[in-house]
């Protein structure tokens, strides 16, 4: 199970027949809708397609609405584009004009009052740099510092200058209301500068009755400086390296990224690393070596998710981009020592709440007993979030009651969200969670799981219970000698003669007891015996020969069926039927 999640941007490339289905099957966890482009009708058509596929495939893919935010853009040029030459003058105006090589209208009418002579203005993520020469009430006269082509609606950035524009435009408000009506799961709030911006956005969502969770996009120095308060107010963070790399000295970006990821991991909130992660795959079927390393380093740092933008929205290889992300993530995660990482994370913490301490105890318990999964049960996903915070190596299965919460959990590191029925008691809760996980195929008969939840049942935010449970009933639950495993068909014998007649190399030998006469067979087999003592002949021989042995399996000769394919797990003293 891949632990790092993949966010993919939808667009014209994903509209092609079958592409969205293949992206989901390749591992897309969150679908991002960029509301800086496209109409509500276009976004609704893509969302409807996503809804149909996630129902058909039972895939909890979250839908994320990415707002335009308080950004400044150029308006239109005659012919759609112009060429700017170093040394020429170029004017940005708040008056509505048809743009040409000498001037163009901008979307923010107060920009001339916010900048002054000597300020730098960057167009199209820094492709063209302008120096402000003078300003008037409606115009900013600039000098072009380098050659470049400029197209309609490209971004305008003013590094180091605080713009006095309101955070939420009418367009953003309309987009949020549309998203609430259509059932989006997340909103990625662009250009968040302070906690007040997050609170303003949350107020609009609350008024609309929406349960969308807010991911604050950090894209400028003000957002970076106010990260602690923003992180406290938001549900998660996006390291939006595109505009950040324009607004802030590019040499600072790696340090800022690492710090932001570390802060999010420490408080247990999801963090998305975004922008140009596999940018070359817009045109090429394979990534560059630098891109591979960029993705891997974000995963090593602990990012919850990695994001594809133009690679999937407008690139030539959207499905291949998702598969590439998936492959890099899986290989990188296989190199991480999760036990060591979890110990380091716990060691550097202040006093934990009861809920967080319970979640940490569930992680350490799962690690120490070699559990196959941690099952978290909660109404809003809080328990899963608390467990995910510690980045355990054990798979986290979030057992949930609500489909939207299930989709929202798709963004959290290491969490596999599934549905379960409502439980009215603690015993019922544990049983229902284990049954739901088994039916979903994420745990199997005989697996050992750690279940954590809140008691009393139905009270949110009360994670305080841990229980160890075995999935289903094992064929044998006895005492294992050593820690070896073995698989094979059962060979049930009641005497030495019967062993000599029936036994084949690779069989799992089941006998009432063993003697030295059976040594030639024991050397070739795993052994299950009814002898009860850990100092019995079978246990002694098993240790001496380093063979898998189960002792104390009362009634095994009578209860088990000849030829059944089984797995013998000595560490847990279990014998379970193979699927």
Which positions does each model-derived feature cover?
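Non-catalytic helical/linker scaffolds that mediate oligomerization, partner binding
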Residues: 1-579
């Amino acid at each position: 199970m891949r632990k790092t999640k993949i966010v993919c941007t939808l667009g014209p490339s994903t509209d092609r027949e079958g592409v969205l289905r293949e992206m989901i099957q390749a591992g897309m966890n969150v679908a991002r809708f960029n509301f800086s482009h496209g109409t509500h009708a276009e976004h609704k058509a893509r969302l409807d397609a996503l809804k149909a596929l996630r129902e058909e495939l039972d895939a909890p893919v979250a839908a994320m609405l990415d707002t335009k935010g308080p950004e400044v853009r150029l308006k239109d040029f005659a012919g759609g584009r112009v060429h700017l030459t170093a040394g020429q003058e170029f004017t940005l105006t708040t008056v509505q004009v048809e743009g040409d090589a000498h001037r163009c209208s901008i979307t923010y009418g107060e920009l001339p009052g916010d900048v002054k002579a000597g300020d730098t203005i960057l167009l199209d993520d820094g492709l063209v740099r302008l120096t402000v020469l003078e300003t008037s009430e409606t115009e900013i006269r600039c000098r072009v510092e380098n050659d470049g082509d400029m197209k309609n609606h490209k971004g305008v950035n003013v590094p180091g200058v605080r713009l006095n524009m309101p955070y939420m435009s009418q367009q953003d408000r309309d987009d949020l209301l549309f998203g609430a009506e259509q059932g989006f799961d997340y909103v990625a709030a662009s250009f968040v500068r302070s906690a007040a911006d997050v609170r303003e956005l949350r107020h609009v969502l609350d008024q609309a009755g929406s349960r969308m969770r807010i991911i604050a996009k950090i894209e400028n120095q003000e957002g970076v400086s106010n990260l602690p308060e923003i992180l406290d107010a938001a549900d998660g963070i996006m390291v939006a390296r595109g505009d950040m790399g324009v607004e802030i000295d590019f040499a600072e970006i790696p340090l800022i990224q690492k710090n932001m990821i570390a802060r999010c991991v420490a408080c247990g909130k999801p963090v998305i690393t975004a922008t140009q992660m596999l940018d070359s795959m817009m045109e090429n079927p394979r990534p560059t070596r630098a891109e591979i390393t960029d993705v891997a380093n974000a995963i090593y740092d602990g990012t919850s998710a990695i994001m594809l933008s133009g690679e999937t929205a407008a690139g030539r290889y959207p499905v291949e981009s998702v598969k590439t992300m998936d492959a890099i993530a899986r290989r990188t995660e296989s190199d991480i020592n999760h036990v060591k990482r979890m110990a380091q994370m716990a060691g550097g913490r202040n006093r934990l709440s009861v809920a967080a301490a319970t979640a940490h105890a569930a992680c350490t318990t799962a690690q120490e007993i070699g559990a196959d999964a941690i099952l978290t049960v909660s109404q809003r996903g809080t328990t899963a979030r608390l467990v995910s915070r510690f980045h355990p190596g054990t798979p986290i299965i979030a057992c949930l009651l609500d489909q939207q919460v299930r989709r929202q959990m798709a963004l959290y590191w290491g969490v596999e969200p599934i549905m379960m029925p409502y439980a009215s008691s603690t015993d019922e809760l544990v049983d229902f969670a284990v049954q739901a996980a088994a039916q979903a195929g994420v745990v199997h008969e005989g697996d050992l799981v750690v279940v954590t939840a809140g008691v009393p049942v139905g009270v949110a935010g009360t994670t305080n219970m841990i229980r160890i449970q075995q999935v289903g009933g094992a064929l044998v639950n006895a005492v294992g000698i050593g820690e070896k495993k073995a698989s094979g068909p059962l060979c049930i014998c009641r005497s030495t003669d019967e062993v000599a007649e029936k036994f084949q190399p690779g069989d799992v030998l089941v006998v009432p007891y063993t003697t030295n006469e059976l040594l030639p067979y024991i050397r070739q087999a795993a052994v299950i015996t009814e002898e009860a003592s850990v100092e019995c002949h079978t246990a002694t021989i098993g240790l001496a020969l380093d063979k898998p042995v189960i002792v104390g399996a009362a009634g095994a000769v009578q209860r088990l069926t000849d030829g059944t394919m089984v797995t013998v797990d000595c560490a847990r003293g279990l014998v379970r039927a193979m699927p």
